[in-house]
Amino acid sequence: MLTGYGQVSDTLGLVDFGGVSFGNIGTGYPYPFPTSQVTYRSPVMSGLRVAVGIMDPVDTTNDASSALDEAYQDSPRFETEITYQFEVGGAQIYSWVNGMQQTSKNTDSTVDEVDSQGIGYGVQAKMAGFSVTASGFQAEGINPFYTNNAGEAQLRDVDSDGYLLQGSYTFGKNRIALSSGKTKDDGNGLGTAADYETRGIAYFRT
């Protein structure tokens, strides 16, 4: 749901550093910033589709306190996604599961390397004018708010997780939507533990 004020922080203002305040940025999922990549997507086979990608990795091991500080990666970030769509009882179902992995090091050998890995999953169901979507993620060593680790926080192998629930009903030219998202983090994104939640309701007329 792209309306609403979005998630805010007492110290940072908007979690995305003062950018747009779309409804659930910062809660429920790491915002997927564009990145250089080579991705293969298979044809849809009986509703099943597989994607595999090699991505430009991001710095996660910056340590400004070290004179030798320089984050680097030996290999790209790997991502994959499996989607499956089908119909049952008159409802259209779209489901997905995805994952990522990357490792970041530092030229200062005293700075621990970070092995980042995560998994995401979700399902969407549509029937008549109703639409319901539920998704979530669990990860270790990632920035739980934005995939490019904006601000280059020094990350650690600590956990984060979140979920996003959205539902809507369309009748005529009208649509009513509800949304609720939550992200919990042990301290990677902001340096201290975070527990953010956003709820929203919207009315659209086209």
Predicted regions span which residues?
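Solvent-exposed, low-complexity segments and loops of surface/extracellular structural proteins
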Residues: 65-69, 192
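Glycine- and other small-residue-rich loops at beta-strand/loop junctions that grip anionic moieties
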Residues: 29, 71, 156
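Outer membrane beta-barrel
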Residues: 1-60, 74-76, 83-89, 125, ...
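Detector for outer-membrane/organellar transmembrane beta-barrel domains
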Residues: 75, 80-201
